[in-house]
Amino acid sequence: MSGRVLITMDDLEVGVPVNAALEEAGLTTAMVSSFDDLRAAVRRAEPEVVVFTGALHERPARELAALARERDAARLALLEPGGQDPGRLVHALGLSAWLVKPMAPAEVASAVQRLIERRRLQERTGILGDSAAIHEVLVKIEQMAPVSSTVLVEGESGTGKELVAQAMHSLSARRERPFIAVNCAALPESLL
């Protein structure tokens, strides 16, 4: 798998092995220090994922998280055990995911690959979101798209049923054919 990852150098004991594991997984990596020009580093690396190795309470980390969010890059934090409350950090920094130290570098590489896959699936379908529910919907779309069968998408008004149907159509073998949305609620029961 290819992908671009930016790693902070706040904790080199974690960052260097993680960098090696990501490169071994076929990802392009760049390491950035809090003393670097963060905006230039993000522009240069064009990351799909930013991995924070520490110092999340400091201003450079918050700035980098905001820059990553502006560029729609996923944000993965490696947290100290018993340290920061993940829920508050997710809200404050807009994190996509987190892992608690110590962890194996391969575990970080796996998490980064999942984030890249999720981001690419969101780009292909046009359905955006970082929640587990949205990720589950995206996985279901990808599973159902190759099936050569009629699919009924149910849900409350305004939940994006047509968007889901269009995403399935765009990923299917029938994508070259016209997409026709049908409001099944408007059809008489006897017709169905």
Where on the chain are the PLM-derived regions?
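N-terminal accessory segments that target, anchor, or regulate ATP-driven/P-loop NTPase machines
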Residues: 1-123
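AAA+ ATPase active-site-proximal loops
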Residues: 123-192
